Amino acid sequence: IKDPYIYLGFQRPPGRSAFKRMIEDQDIEALESCFDRIPVKTGETYFIPGGRPHAIGPGILMVEVMEPSDLAVRFEFERGGYVLPESARFMERGLDFCLEVFDYEPLPLEEAITRYRCLPRERQTWPGGGQQFSLLEHERNPRFTLRQSVFTSESQWIGNEAFIGIVTAGSGIIDDGQERREVGPYSR
């Protein structure tokens, strides 16, 4: 994809009845007209709080971390030939309930980027070529943190907190003293 993008917050909020009609009629063009595209690059991070409407453009591989209490409402019912089952569209609560979830305040494009883009801050380095960057910390979101670890050569990750690791490039070995595992992009 030449110009990947996301939608984040309504730049031109629809009224609730107009929004309901757009969803019921699956008028994707009208839905998209409520947003401006935010160009994104590999490695960027955005923190999008619950209630803020958002969508992911084509060709983006991403990790989405959600709080267990987050509600997932789908505007679009069909994508790439897959039709979302009716029970998965509105959490079995109906469209009228789900329309109450959204923040309808206008969010100018530059404010969306400034407010919700998370700039990496170096957090620590490890011997041998490892660095960890803070992407999202408790002062911005008290429920979870998000960090990026980058290894350019053999290094030792030092930490005692639980984590989920996703390898996006390169390969390596994870050895916790009890188990040794080779990892590469998207391995399990």
PLM region descriptions:
Residues 47-50, 58:
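Conserved "cap/hinge" positions at secondary-structure junctions
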